[in-house]
Amino acid sequence: YTLDQTRYDLIRRIADNSGMIPDEGISLENAEEYIRRSILFTGIHNGEKVLYMPDELVNIFVSEDGSELKSIVDRNTEWILLTQGLLYYYGVMNLTDYTKKMEELTGRKIADSSEFMNILYSAGEFYGQFKLTLHGFKNSKILDEEKIINYHRQAKVEFYPFTTLFQYT
């Protein structure tokens, strides 16, 4: 599962409303992420624009929703928020340093790197705040990542010690 709290809440809301909600200003970019994955569809119902989730998907979501899914959503949310913060501060991080920092901050080893990368790739696409590149991860506002990487190499300074003071639930 690549869901974080924001995306989980939207799907939960749609599932709680029999698979359909009015399209109330959900950005086109965010809706496209769900549409590309064939989770949600746009339509018109009684003359009103709606987002629709097929009954089959609603049923699967409802049957899977529980403490295990909530735990995964919480973990994913933590990873995504930490990634946004780290890349806002550092700009660019190679995968080795990034993974080490994430494990240090969360106190958990990343057991499945493929799942980890899928979650972060999906979040990067959805939120547009960071991207996976040949060098690792970068903040989307960085135009010249080579320059940042070279600066990191020249500075020979350790990464600033972050803590996890935010409350994301």
Question: What is each residue range found by the language model?
Answer:
Residues T2-L28, I80-E103:
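Short amphipathic alpha-helical interface segments
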Residues Y1-R7, D55-L81:
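Phosphate/pyrophosphate-recognition segments in soluble nucleotide-handling domains
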Residues L10, S122-Q129:
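Low-complexity, interaction-prone regions
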Residues F41-L69, L120, Q129-R153:
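Accessory beta->alpha helical hairpin/"wing" motif in late/C-terminal subdomains of nucleic-acid enzymes
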Residues I21-N46, R108-Y121:
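Short amphipathic alpha-helical interaction segments
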Residues M20, L40, V92-M93, F126-Q129:
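Intrinsically disordered or highly flexible coil/loop and linker segments, enriched in small
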Residues I72-L86, K101-I119, G136-T169:
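Phospho-regulated, low-complexity intrinsically disordered regions of nuclear gene-regulatory
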Residues D4-Q5, P54, N94, K109-D112:
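Helix N-cap and loop-to-helix transition residues
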